[in-house]
Regions:
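C-terminal beta-signal and adjacent terminal beta-strands/loops
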Residues: 76, 84-102, 121, 128-199
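Outer-membrane beta-barrel transmembrane strands
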Residues: 6-15, 19-21, 58, 114-129, ...
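Gram-negative outer-membrane beta-barrel transporters
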Residues: 2-93
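Extracellular/periplasm-exposed beta-strand and loop segments of Gram-negative cell-envelope proteins
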Residues: 1-8, 36-46, 51-59, 92-98, ...
Length: 199
C-alpha cells in the first residue's frame, strides 16, 4: 500500500440543497451524490491494482445527506437537531484464503470491493443566550450538545482475525478467517460550550 504507482482518477457528482432561513422553525438540508474512482496504468502484472480496472477510492461516498432543523423558542432559547448520513467507506475483502503453517493468510485480488455499514448520526443542541448587561463588557451564551442521540454504533474500520469455533453469518461465511468491526463513540456524548464576544 505504500508503493507509488502510475494511475489516474476521476470524480463527479451533483448536489441539491433546500433551505428555510426564516421563521420559528428554520433549517436546511443538503444531499450529494458523487463518485471518486481510481485506476492504475501499469503493463507489468505485478504492478497492477485491481487488474487496471476502475475501483472506488477510499474517499468514495456515493450518498451524503446533512440536515439541520432549528426551533426558535424565544430570543433566549434555540433548540436544534442535526442529522448526518453517508455511504460506508470502501474497504477490501479477501477473495480467498490459504493456510501457511497453521496461519490463514488472506489473498486480495480486487481493491475496495466492499463497504462498511452506512454512517448516520443525530445530534441535539440547546443554545441559551443572555441579554445585554450594562455591568458586563461582553455578551455570552451557553450551548448544551448531545452527540449521537440514539447510540448508533458507526463502523470505523474492519479487521481480520483467526476464527475459532462455530461459523456465524460474518463476511467470510464458511472460512477460517473471521472479521471484527471497530466502532467509536457508541453512546451519546454530552458537550457544554460557553461562547462570549466583547462589545
Amino acid at each position: 500500500e505504500r508503493d507509488v504507482i502510475q494511475g489516474e482518477g476521476q470524480a463527479y457528482g451533483v448536489e441539491l440543497s433546500l433551505r428555510k432561513p426564516r421563521g420559528k422553525v428554520n433549517g436546511w438540508f443538503n444531499y450529494t451524490w458523487s463518485r471518486s474512482l481510481l485506476r492504475s496504468q501499469n503493463e507489468k502484472l505485478a504492478d497492477r491494482v485491481n487488474n487496471n480496472q476502475w475501483y472506488p477510492s477510499d474517499f468514495d461516498r456515493p450518498h451524503v445527506l446533512n440536515g439541520t432543523v432549528n426551533f426558535e423558542g424565544d430570543k433566549y432559547n434555540t433548540w436544534s437537531f442535526n442529522f448526518t448520513a453517508q455511504s460506508g467507506r470502501p474497504f477490501t475483502v479477501a477473495n480467498s484464503v490459504f493456510a501457511l503453517e497453521d496461519i490463514n493468510v488472506p489473498i486480495f485480488i480486487e481493491r475496495n470491493n466492499a463497504r462498511l455499514r452506512p454512517y448516520h448520526r443525530l445530534d441535539f443542541s440547546w443554545k441559551i443566550k443572555y441579554g445585554r448587561n450594562p455591568n458586563r463588557k461582553w455578551v455570552g451564551d451557553w450551548t448544551f450538545t448531545i452527540y449521537n442521540l440514539y447510540s448508533r454504533r458507526n463502523p470505523f474500520n474492519l479487521y481480520y482475525s483467526q476464527r475459532q469455533g462455530a461459523v456465524d453469518s460474518e463476511i467470510f461465511l464458511g472460512s477460517p478467517l473471521g472479521t471484527y468491526e471497530l466502532s467509536v463513540m457508541n453512546s451519546p456524548l454530552l458537550a457544554i460550550t460557553y461562547n462570549f464576544v466583547f462589545d
